[in-house]
Amino acid sequence: DGNLDLITVGKSGSDAFTDIFMNSGAPDYKFVADWDMIEAFPGLSSESNDNGSKLLVAFDYNNDGWTDLLINGSAGGVWEEITGGTGQGRVCAIMKNNHGTFELLKNPVDGTENFIGVNGGSIDVADFNNDGWMDILVTGYHDEYKSITKLYKNNGNDTFTEVTGIDFVGHQQGETAFIDVNNDGYADIIEIGRDVNNGWAAFGKLYINNQDGTFTRHEEAETNFFGGGCALAIGDVNNDGLNDYFMTGWNTNATFMYNNGDNSFTKQELIPDDARCRGGSATFVNIDNDGF
């Protein structure tokens, strides 16, 4: 209808919720809870204050012009079971928008399986192979596989296929995101968090898109960034045409990482430690309209 609606997820006390508010439009622009839609969703949370909090991404996975939703986190109950879980309450799923109503996309992985349910990590979307379809990046903790990172390629037919052969670490308490590091028009991947499979060691990894459906870990970039319980914001901070990023978490200072243009970053701790947080989120926005 041309009006932006609102979705909130998280915990209130001990109860997890997913609430949807519809924008009434002009002249009042009131947000009214849509209980029919709310009942279609599980209540979602990150489960712990140390965990990542990116539980929801809005995107159009099937290019039909309607905004779908990718969700992950702790849900439990019947919802966790129908998305292929094993009783630990972890969910990763797509809610398909059918002209204003939502339903679960069943068996999205090759038409036979569900996404691996995780919590404590993050989700992101981008068209990593430039075929016109949005792909999915999922990371977090699973009771059987421990910390994992998975990339799913969108096949354009309501199914996704896992992209294998990438030397992901997998993590909890962090964030994994798409970022075009080298301005070649292909989305690379940055992975920052704590490796549950390796004594909860904090780490940061950069994976360069080879433009052929594969990625190569860029070892030289590893020593410059790491963190736990972190949140990422990606953008061109200094207007040099290169994507930088900001990182904050309980295991690291609030830090800007400036893109050097050679698949490496330089750390700049330019803001007070008051910006340091855990289990939160960060974003860039031009508040004063000065071009930065």
Language model region names:
Residues 22-51, 91, 95-118, 152-171, ...:
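Blade-edge motifs of beta-propeller repeat domains
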Residues 2-8, 65-71, 132-134, 138, ...:
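Glycine-aliphatic tripeptides that mark coil-to-beta-strand junctions in extracellular
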Residues 15-17, 87-91, 146-148, 200-203, ...:
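A detector of repeated loop/turn-to-beta-strand junctions in beta-rich toroidal repeat architectures
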Residues 171-177, 192, 196, 225-234, ...:
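Beta-propeller domains
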Residues 11-15, 75-79, 141-145, 194-198, ...:
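Short glycine/acidic-enriched loop and turn motifs that connect beta-strands
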